[in-house]
């Protein structure tokens, strides 16, 4: 299947996602998965990672009692790396490129913002000189962002569950030393924030109901 047809399939799935979420559907994560699969299924480890994050977010949304926001978290988890898809690359910063694509296709803004800000994107955007581009999106509620980020940071590149420390180590090894993720301890700052007072002592996000 050509990249053009994959793009169209993803766009159609996102329009369906938007209608489902506007109508209060509780099964819209399947449309988010379809959109991600259309654009990422040919990317090997990237797609396996996304599948793992989707599964992790599903578990966390249930365990942490996020209520009606659970479908938003699940959708954002499936879509968090969609900006890596070659047809979407513009700035080269996948949270922004992905969020722009989602917004252009009518995805609810809360899902868009979770994709834009996931896993310390605010720190990396500053290092890349893309803070203004990221600021085009509103910051999402921290308790929802933490769920998506924790799911991402506890899923390895092949989709297997890993510790946050293992995942951060893998990221640092994978990116060259001149990458923005190495500057000023960006990855370390991300880890510290995920394990800060906003989460449990082990870095796991707090149940939303207890906040």
Regions found by a protein language model. Give the residues of each.
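N-terminal glycine-rich anion-binding loops that anchor highly charged ligand groups
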Residues: 28-30, 49, 71-74
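Divalent metal-dependent phosphate-bond-processing catalytic cores, especially two-metal-ion Mg2+/Mn2+ enzymes
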Residues: 2-26, 38-67, 79, 105-107, ...
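His-Asp-centered metal-binding catalytic motifs of divalent-metal-dependent phosphohydrolases/nucleases
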Residues: 69-102, 112-122, 152
């Amino acid at each position: 299947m050509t990249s053009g047809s994959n793009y169209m399939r993803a766009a159609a799935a996102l329009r369906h996602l938007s209608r489902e979420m506007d109508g209060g559907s509780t099964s819209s994560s399947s449309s988010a998965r379809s959109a991600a699969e259309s654009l990422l299924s040919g990317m090997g480890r990237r797609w396996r990672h996304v599948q793992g994050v989707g599964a992790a977010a599903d578990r966390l949304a249930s365990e942490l009692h996020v209520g009606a926001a659970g479908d938003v978290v699940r959708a954002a988890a499936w879509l968090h790396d969609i900006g890596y898809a070659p047809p979407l690359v513009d700035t080269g910063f996948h949270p922004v490129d992905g969020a722009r694509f989602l917004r252009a296709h009518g995805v609810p803004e809360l899902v868009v913002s979770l994709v834009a800000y996931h896993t310390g994107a605010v720190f990396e955007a500053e290092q890349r000189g893309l803070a203004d581009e990221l600021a085009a999106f509103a910051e999402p509620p921290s308790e929802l962002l933490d769920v998506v980020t924790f799911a991402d940071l506890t899923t390895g590149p092949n989709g297997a569950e890993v510790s946050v420390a293992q995942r951060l180590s893998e990221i640092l090894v994978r990116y060259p030393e001149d990458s923005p993720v190495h500057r000023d301890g960006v990855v370390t700052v991300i880890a510290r924030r995920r394990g800060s007072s906003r989460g449990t002592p082990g870095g796991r996000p707090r149940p939303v109901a207890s906040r």
